[in-house]
């Protein structure tokens, strides 16, 4: 039986690869990238928007991987949880939310404690501290007597040592309301792992639940100062408990815990530790009988209340490909695997018919500047094999390097990561052109394009709001058809080159026109 070889359309998402003309600590521009340079000169290209209102975020808010992949995969501007929650606060309906009211009612009924856990940060990527402050005010208004904040510290979507301002704000608010205090602090490295480093999660869980930690101090500010003295920036603060009047706070039966992060991927692991009856990733003293509420849905398998449940979009790129009987592959290493699957499919866990997935484990290193190539070699090997197989109509892949190494603030390592990616792109280009396929290269947001803040001269570990590239590599003649494009225009462009009709739910526009 003759096997029909498919001409693959490949979407390569270079996570954290923004565009900037500045060469000031720009790891992308200053790296040695002969393949990228030649592609940029030879093939049709443009720059598109990956942040702010154009991706459903508040004005001037930097984009992120979750938001980026949702917008790309859905082919429309998807208004994000941050925007929805901000709107609820603005319209004064946040305190009327059924799940939040139930968590508070549980505390009042049992004369127990309310615990808020989450990333205390103005970063706006995984959480926003203003949501936490609003929750504290609502708790006071509704009659809560004892509220304890377990603060995860950022230093990744914010400057590495910037938590003091947020801690002072939280401390002052709690003190002014005579409501409680910050009961524990820890870096997001521990509480917000997403790579199955359960030893990290265990330390955070034990500090929050059992008041069991390597360090105990009299205030959150003292804990932060001592962490800095140990040369631990915000992200890496070792889980620490705070003692007030000789008292350490534990989470007990009948308490309520509200998780204030709105982004799912880094909130899942510790949520399972709180809620799973048969949890076995590390020992717990007991399975707590608590009301556990999450701001958004982190995982459909979690047994908890959700304040802002997801709205499932229809006719995403994956669904349209399935309806047209096309085969598709999603591939990434662990750090970005949820993004090319769950987020790309608009918050859908299940695979579509005809959708295969390949997960490449991320390297087990403390920080990725220690291994800037990460798992890109293995990802590329699998990608080239998939292209050569002729099995797939469409492949979506993510390279994590420019984002994950960019987050370390290590400029030299970021350049090494970019240079390695350039070699990977060369292999993909050769394979696609050999098989008469189509390749689009883009990014979900910027990061490695600014490794040092020019104003402060300090490491810049957060995302940027710079535009991102969108390049077509293939044998078709293509012309830019859309100025000022955005991430939601990518899916319509892929459908266009594949000859598939765009559904009405996709409001994006094609970026390139192709000669028939």
Curated annotation (Swiss-Prot):
<feature type="binding site">
    <location>
        <position position="15"/>
    </location>
    <ligand>
        <name>Mn(2+) 2</name>
    </ligand>
</feature>
<comment type="similarity">
    <text>Belongs to the BPG-independent phosphoglycerate mutase family.</text>
</comment>
<feature type="binding site">
    <location>
        <position position="445"/>
    </location>
    <ligand>
        <name>Mn(2+) 2</name>
    </ligand>
</feature>
<keyword id="KW-0479">Metal-binding</keyword>
<dbReference type="InterPro" id="IPR017850">
    <property type="entry name" value="Alkaline_phosphatase_core_sf"/>
</dbReference>
<keyword id="KW-0413">Isomerase</keyword>
<feature type="active site" description="Phosphoserine intermediate">
    <location>
        <position position="65"/>
    </location>
</feature>
<dbReference type="GO" id="GO:0004619">
    <property type="term" value="F:phosphoglycerate mutase activity"/>
</dbReference>
<feature type="binding site">
    <location>
        <position position="403"/>
    </location>
    <ligand>
        <name>Mn(2+) 1</name>
    </ligand>
</feature>
<feature type="binding site">
    <location>
        <position position="65"/>
    </location>
    <ligand>
        <name>Mn(2+) 2</name>
    </ligand>
</feature>
<protein>
    <recommendedName>
        <fullName>2,3-bisphosphoglycerate-independent phosphoglycerate mutase</fullName>
        <ecNumber>5.4.2.12</ecNumber>
    </recommendedName>
</protein>
<feature type="binding site">
    <location>
        <position position="188"/>
    </location>
    <ligand>
        <name>substrate</name>
    </ligand>
</feature>
<feature type="binding site">
    <location>
        <position position="194"/>
    </location>
    <ligand>
        <name>substrate</name>
    </ligand>
</feature>
<feature type="binding site">
    <location>
        <position position="463"/>
    </location>
    <ligand>
        <name>Mn(2+) 1</name>
    </ligand>
</feature>
<dbReference type="InterPro" id="IPR036646">
    <property type="entry name" value="PGAM_B_sf"/>
</dbReference>
<feature type="binding site">
    <location>
        <position position="407"/>
    </location>
    <ligand>
        <name>Mn(2+) 1</name>
    </ligand>
</feature>
<comment type="subunit">
    <text>Monomer.</text>
</comment>
<dbReference type="GO" id="GO:0006096">
    <property type="term" value="P:glycolytic process"/>
</dbReference>
<keyword id="KW-0464">Manganese</keyword>
<dbReference type="GO" id="GO:0005829">
    <property type="term" value="C:cytosol"/>
</dbReference>
<dbReference type="Pfam" id="PF01676">
    <property type="entry name" value="Metalloenzyme"/>
</dbReference>
<comment type="function">
    <text>Catalyzes the interconversion of 2-phosphoglycerate and 3-phosphoglycerate.</text>
</comment>
<comment type="pathway">
    <text>Carbohydrate degradation; glycolysis; pyruvate from D-glyceraldehyde 3-phosphate: step 3/5.</text>
</comment>
<feature type="binding site">
    <location>
        <begin position="156"/>
        <end position="157"/>
    </location>
    <ligand>
        <name>substrate</name>
    </ligand>
</feature>
<feature type="binding site">
    <location>
        <position position="126"/>
    </location>
    <ligand>
        <name>substrate</name>
    </ligand>
</feature>
<dbReference type="GO" id="GO:0006007">
    <property type="term" value="P:glucose catabolic process"/>
</dbReference>
<dbReference type="GO" id="GO:0030145">
    <property type="term" value="F:manganese ion binding"/>
</dbReference>
<feature type="binding site">
    <location>
        <position position="336"/>
    </location>
    <ligand>
        <name>substrate</name>
    </ligand>
</feature>
<dbReference type="Pfam" id="PF06415">
    <property type="entry name" value="iPGM_N"/>
</dbReference>
<feature type="binding site">
    <location>
        <position position="444"/>
    </location>
    <ligand>
        <name>Mn(2+) 2</name>
    </ligand>
</feature>
<dbReference type="InterPro" id="IPR011258">
    <property type="entry name" value="BPG-indep_PGM_N"/>
</dbReference>
<dbReference type="InterPro" id="IPR006124">
    <property type="entry name" value="Metalloenzyme"/>
</dbReference>
<dbReference type="InterPro" id="IPR005995">
    <property type="entry name" value="Pgm_bpd_ind"/>
</dbReference>
<feature type="binding site">
    <location>
        <begin position="263"/>
        <end position="266"/>
    </location>
    <ligand>
        <name>substrate</name>
    </ligand>
</feature>
<keyword id="KW-0324">Glycolysis</keyword>
